[in-house]
């Protein structure tokens, strides 16, 4: 990873920046949705919002460590760069579990709220959260598939909420 990034530093930085912006928007939207729950699901929504904020912190720490590793590698300090990159990758290990907890809590809050999303869509948040929490650490490919499904769930929910606002 470090060799590839050093050879194509501009492309790597662009990919990191676009990915970072995407993930900040996605996690912020989930945190805001959790905070918007006002009735029966308010407590679960608030806790989900905190969990999504923690997931965002994992992203920031991991990216910072990885960028530091790339700088050290470019300076020729390969041993320290590899150590930092391993720490960056290790920070990601908690990502699927926290993400699954966040989705589950948000989904339960949405089910209890009965608005703004239909119960089926809210229930899919719960299902995606439980599946991500349990299955993502077992199999990387399955974890990534669950991640993509959860992104589609968020997009679908966003479209539904935007149409409902009109």
Predicted regions and their residues:
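Hydrophobic, aromatic-enriched alpha-helical segments typical of multi-pass transmembrane helices
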Residues: 1-166
């Amino acid at each position: 990873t470090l060799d590839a990034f050093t050879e194509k530093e501009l492309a790597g930085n662009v990919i990191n920046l676009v990915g970072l912006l995407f993930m900040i928007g996605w996690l912020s939207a989930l945190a805001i949705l959790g905070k918007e729950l006002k009735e029966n699901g308010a407590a679960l929504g608030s806790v989900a919002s905190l969990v999504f904020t923690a997931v965002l912190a994992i992203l920031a720490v991991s990216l910072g460590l990885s960028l530091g590793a790339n700088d050290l590698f470019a300076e020729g300090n390969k041993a320290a760069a590899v150590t930092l990159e391993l720490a960056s990758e290790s920070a990601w290990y908690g990502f699927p579990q926290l993400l699954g907890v966040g989705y589950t809590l948000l989904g339960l809050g949405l089910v209890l709220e009965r608005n703004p999303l239909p119960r089926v869509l809210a229930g899919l948040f719960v299902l995606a959260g439980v599946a991500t929490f349990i299955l993502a650490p077992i199999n990387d490919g399955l974890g990534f598939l669950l991640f993509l499904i959860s992104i589609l769930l968020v997009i679908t929910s966003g479209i539904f909420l935007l149409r409902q606002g009109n």
